[in-house]
Amino acid sequence: MKTILYILFAATMMVGCNNSKATKVFDSVDATRFAEVIENEQVQIIDTRTPEEFSEGHIPGAVNIDIDSEEFTAKVAELDKSRPVAVYCRGGRRSKEAAEHMVNCGLEVTELTDGILSWKGEVDK
């Protein structure tokens, strides 16, 4: 009986995971398109780099939520799900990871493909 319950549980989990992966996606865009996206005042701009990297220069209006911090998941949960999110990091790896987490939390996400290294716009320090 335990074996049957275990198999049913495992099958349910696999189907659930596959469905969520197939339907929850985010847009990865270049710097030009990212600039257009963040022109919308409703967009929440999230920088996933460390606080030190953030202080060296960030896109105006960005909020720092370090993906490697213990508070990352809690801070993402506090974001307004009725507003889109634009996320970036230094080169694109961390923001892709963050974007995957964010869409699984129910957020609409646009990610800057090559990070702030590709950004041609204004930077705040």
Which positions does each model-derived feature cover?
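Rhodanese-like catalytic fold shared by cysteine-dependent sulfurtransferases
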Residues: 2-4, 12, 17-32, 37, ...
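Structural scaffold elements adjacent to functional motifs in cytosolic proteins
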Residues: 45-47
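Oxyanion-binding "anion nests"
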Residues: 8
